[in-house]
C-alpha cells in the first residue's frame, strides 16, 4: 500500500515538473517569436517597375503587429502563471482564481496570433497603385526569412502549450489538485507522505 502511494506521488510529481518545464518553454518561445517579428524591419524593397524604394517593416502587416502584441502579452501572462504555479499555497484563493483565467487566455492569444500570421504568409503591399509581393522582390530575403522564423517559433510555442495542457490534465496529475504541485522539491511532498506514514506504522 505504501509503495503504491509513493509511486503515485512520484508519478504526479514528474508530471508536475514536465508541465512546469513546458510552461517555461512556452514563455521563452513566445518572447522569441515577438522579438524576431519586432526586429524584422529595415529591409529596403526595390520595385521591379521602377517605383521608389520602400522600407518594409512588420508594422506594414496587421497580423504581424498582432503577433508581436499577442505574444508579448501571452508571455507576460505565462510568466504570472508560472509564478503562481510555483509559489501558490494550498489554500491560495488568488492562484485558484487567476490560474484558470490565465490558462484560458494564453492559448487564445498564441493560437490566434499564429493563425493570423500564417494567413498573411503571402506578404504584399500596395505601392504606386499596384500590389507588390514582398518575398518576390529583391533584397527581401532577410525580412521574409526572419518573419517566417518568427511564425514557426510562435507555432512551436502553441504546440508546447498544447502538450503542457495535456500533461496538466493527465489522469495521474488530476489527483494532485490545486495544492502545490509538489514534485520539484516543494514541501507538499512531506504533506503527502503523512497518510502513508500513518498507514505503515499503524499496525506496529
UniProtKB/Swiss-Prot annotation:
Location in the cell: Cell membrane
Extracellular side, ranges: 41-63, 119-146
GO CC annotation: plasma membrane
Disordered: annotated span: 173-204
Cited InterPro entries: CASP/CASPL (IPR006459), CASP_dom (IPR006702), CASPL (IPR044173)
Main subcellular location: membrane
Keywords for the protein's UniProt record, in alphabetical order: Cell membrane, Membrane, Transmembrane, Transmembrane helix
Cytoplasmic face residues: 1-19, 85-97, 168-204
Annotated membrane topology: Multi-pass membrane protein
TM annotation in the entry: 20-40, 64-84, 98-118, 147-167
Quaternary organization: Homodimer and heterodimers.
Protein family: Belongs to the Casparian strip membrane proteins (CASP) family.
Protein name, entry field: CASP-like protein 1U3
Phylogenetic lineage: Eukaryota, Viridiplantae, Streptophyta, Embryophyta, Tracheophyta
